[in-house]
């Protein structure tokens, strides 16, 4: 997974959108080098919002200075993907690396 994320990061700007807290984020940054691939972080504990709240995704779009149709949101929770899709973001449910690669071909 880390190598695929790094490959994506070499061609696209990547942001991490996570329902997390400061403790888990610090652990991830210390233990998973893939975290360095992301240019921006949208973290629930900093935003005081949680996915799948549509306001969460509006906040992300504002932070990215991006329109929904120019973004792809990938998550393993269908309700989060549905919420992002409802405001126009290309949403993909993560099930496996192979399926994700195939799904990304249709939106990138």
Where are these regions (language model features)?
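Short, acidic loop-to-helix structural element flanking the phosphoryl-transfer center
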Residues: 1-14, 54, 97
């Amino acid at each position: 997974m880390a190598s695929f994320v790094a490959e994506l990061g070499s061609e696209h700007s990547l942001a991490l959108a996570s329902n997390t807290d400061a403790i888990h984020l610090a652990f991830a940054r210390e233990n998973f080098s893939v975290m360095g691939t992301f240019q921006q972080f949208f973290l629930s504990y900093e935003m005081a919002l949680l996915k799948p709240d549509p306001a969460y995704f509006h906040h992300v779009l504002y932070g990215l200075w991006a329109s929904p149709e120019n973004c792809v949101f990938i998550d393993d929770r269908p309700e989060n993907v549905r919420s992002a899709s409802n405001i126009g973001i290309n949403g993909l449910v993560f099930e496996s690396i192979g399926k994700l690669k195939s799904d990304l071909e249709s939106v990138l």
